[in-house]
Amino acid sequence: MAKVMRLIIFVCVALVAISVPAASSVQSQQERIRPGFRQQLPSSIRPFSAFRRRGQEASDSVVYLNIVYLRLVGTRQCATGELTVVVHGKALNNATLGDVQTSLTRTFASSLKEPSSTLAIRRWSWKDPLFLMLTLNRRAVRTGTGLPRSTPLYQVAKQRLFVFVRKPTPTSSCRRAALDPRPLYGVPKVGVQDKYTLHVSMDVLGMSLREPLEHQEEEPGPASVSTYAAAQAILDGASSFGIGAFGSAKPNLKQISMYASGAELEKQVYTPTTSQLALFLPSKTFFGVEVTSVSDGTFRIPVSASRLVPFSAMSYMCTGSQTHKLTQTGMNVLEKRVHGKENPPSEGAEVLLNLLAARKPVNGVFEQDPTVVLLQLWRTPEGSESWQETPLMWEFPDTLEAIEDAGEYRSGILSSIAANTRIIGKMAGWLASRSFSRRFIRTLIRLNNIDLEEAFSMSDKDRRHSAADFRSVQEFFTRPINYHVYRDMDPRASIMAPADSLIQNIYTIRPDFKGEISHPIIPQVKSTSFNLREFLYGARQVPPLQLQSPSNRLFVSILYLAPSDYHRVHSPADWRVTSQTYIPGCTPSVSRRNLEAGDLLHRYERTALIGHWDPEKNGQQLFFSVTMVAAMFVGGLRLSWEEEPLGASMRLGRCTRYTESYEKQVDVELCASQEIGAFRFGSTVVMIFEAPEDFDMTSVGQCSHVAAGQPAGYLGQGRERPLQERCNAFRGNFESPFHFWKHLQKTSSVDDILKQNTLAPRAWRQEPGRVWAEVLRATERGLLYGFALSHYLLKRWATENGNLGELVLGQPEVLRQNINGSDSVIREGFRCFAAKDKKQIRLQMSGRQSQVSLTATVTPDEQFLFQHPFYGCVGDEKLGKLVRGIDATWILLPERAVLLTLKVSTGSKQEDGRVLRVATTKIEVQTEPCQGGWEESRVGTTSTTCAIRTVEKREESISEGVLTNGDL
């Protein structure tokens, strides 16, 4: 037995030794930023990765270094952290490890305050994980001496490196060898968002290659260089195009050579890659744009670089690129701005540089997703340089239905076994509905980073009113949330997102001259496609889809729900369902990976709801449909007006190409935000609807994550959605939860509408007025106690003078060069991280061009942030918890201090608990002047730490109303 155990240990060690060099190989940028289950596995449990074919190797101008470092956990204990260093340069073959060491010395200067301490780098060997695990908590840690600074960079580019603080003695305490991670808090993360990324330019920084003195690190001290000079070095050889004469009827865009000179260079617009943008605008919000046709302003955006919404055990996947087209207005604005004819920062300022890029939208509904921008670098007569950003309007180009046939369904033994999952799905569904499955709920929460604050938002201290007592995994996945409070909606929007999901595709289809959608095959993902008529109606023969006008368009949007998402589906618009068709089929996974592999949506089990809508309320009956597609282990789709799940009682055999569908004529009026169904696990929702040609669906984009109820489509020319009185029973008709609550108090008659929802508990529906009363109570409870982090910041944080915490600002130089010096948090860019000991929280805010990290202390009296049912800052250790209900803006003041403004809305009881008071408050956080050193850097990733000086809280608006439920 002992020999067998020794053999097993030897094999495991050998496999680990094989895997580490391969796992630390330089990955291409595309592989690095595409999150998948394999990429998230530690290299130690991917032993055969050495035999897998790698993607593109790093080009000669970019080298990726995987860095492991020590960080403090508590007062004495240490743990390891990881970061990626991206080294840019045109002659990296001559670069040495000392160049990177000099850059890291500047970043981690706060870790080298002790005399004779230096930053050392050595190779990370396969022994280190085990060695550090055994010695990290001891008084002495042997870290080694480090590699010589003259080591060529290419020799270590394919290896994992270990960075530590070196002392003259061969051994050191863990605390003294660890790096201070605070400078990284302002650094953007990429890919699966569990690694920080530092960008370094070898060409611009002018780093010294000389050997340092013994026991003393050489100070970096690069010569100060202007942003324009740095950009010229970075953009040398980048793609570009030229702008024609100003004032022409149509902008004359033309491709020009990178070696053009004279007047053409002054009108040149660069299209840098995401990697180039990351040097002088290091932000995860900016990404490259590839112009495909300069004549009509068509461009493509690599979605893998633009948006990722990851979570721990599995993730959304988006690859490929998406095509957009500048509108005529966008092209005119581009031409005028490039020629410097509009909005110069000051009189006499000249344009030095024009960049075409894209970024994520900020919070709100008034920016396109993605937001395409012209970035201009200006120089004033006094010699100062500043950035200016101008959004450019774009539109979806019409999809021409030129595809004649769909791809064949995959065949083969393995594909057949994988596709025939109906019996397995039923077994999994039966197990998930048993009470013993409840013990696995916490595991699912941890693996998928599920938002506990939302998941338990329907919990009530009186269990008679609670809808968050989950007796099985199935009940947890179909859980309700306090949708009326936790979702932002815009009553002006004609289309709202039907579910928490990732938008896999969104495009428009132009009909023929008769208004018919003549070809039934439409594109889906990459090279795959699906049959529109078969997808909606099954295999039966139906006439071509006829639009009301040849000038209208058919909009198609495919939305993917992951296991972490809220799994109820809400109506995206005010419309009428006239038929529902249940189409049996296969139930394999509908993940994007499978879609790209050839699985087609029209082969899947699904329920198609078909009807019509009148977006302008002028008597039209435009085609509208919402189709819910089942996923593996799902089946049994639940509709809010059906007592039993569809397909649950049907005796269906093996998964085959069914030639039969089950149609039912209905007459169901639905309102925007009204519940229409629920899934039992992850799946897909497909919206296909007819709308006027100028209908705007650009507020959300492909591969962006949307929340149920989020505005997704608007009528053109500023027209607003006509509100219907019958829809006043639902949140979608109101601007805020408070307005909805005030109306609900006066209209108990809407109970007749609300109790028709079969997803509500049966006991509530059987009691007259009960459903209305429970919706009213849940809304009051959410207004009073929702958004626990807002309550902590407003009522508990900084109430007494003392340690107010600190703030880390990422990219201060870029923010300083912004014309107004301000930035704001992007959509879904606000996250909360809690320390393991629950004594500190860190608020991470990602802006358009900079990042802010705010650290605050949590006392024992404030532990409600981590407790049931509030969970205000409970999430994955690396990914954090998404923060809702707080807006953030920040500005870099002339004295190099930061002013951070948080806007929160909280509720409280007044007058002996009879009055609900909802106040919107501004929290202004003023810091001391930030640490210096970053002013000399014009490229690369920089950050600075600022101590908080004062915290001021000022109420802006107050709304009050009488509580219906005084016992809350």
UniProtKB/Swiss-Prot annotation:
InterPro entries to which the protein is assigned, alphabetical: PS_Dcarbxylase, PSD-B
Catalytic activity field: a 1,2-diacyl-sn-glycero-3-phospho-L-serine + H(+) = a 1,2-diacyl-sn-glycero-3-phosphoethanolamine + CO2
* One GO MF term: phosphatidylserine decarboxylase activity
What pathway does this protein act in? Phospholipid metabolism; phosphatidylethanolamine biosynthesis; phosphatidylethanolamine from CDP-diacylglycerol: step 2/2
Sorted alphabetically, the keyword list is:
Cytoplasmic vesicle, Decarboxylase, Lipid biosynthesis, Lipid metabolism, Lyase, Phospholipid biosynthesis, Phospholipid metabolism, Pyruvate, Signal, Zymogen
Maturation and modification: Is synthesized initially as an inactive proenzyme. Formation of the active enzyme involves a self-maturation process in which the active site pyruvoyl group is generated from an internal serine residue via an autocatalytic post-translational modification. Two non-identical subunits are generated from the proenzyme in this reaction, and the pyruvate is formed at the N-terminus of the alpha chain, which is derived from the carboxyl end of the proenzyme.
Q: Where is the active site?
A: 500, 570, 683
Which parts of the sequence are marked as the site Cleavage (non-hydrolytic)? 682-683
Is Lipid metabolism one of the keywords UniProt gives this record? yes
Record keyword Cell wall biogenesis/degradation present: no
Which one GO biological process term can you cite for this protein? phosphatidylethanolamine biosynthetic process
- S-S bonds: none
| Catalytic class of the enzyme | lyase
Q: What is this protein called?
A: Phosphatidylserine decarboxylase 2 proenzyme
Q: Which organism is it from?
A: Toxoplasma gondii (strain ATCC 50853 / GT1)
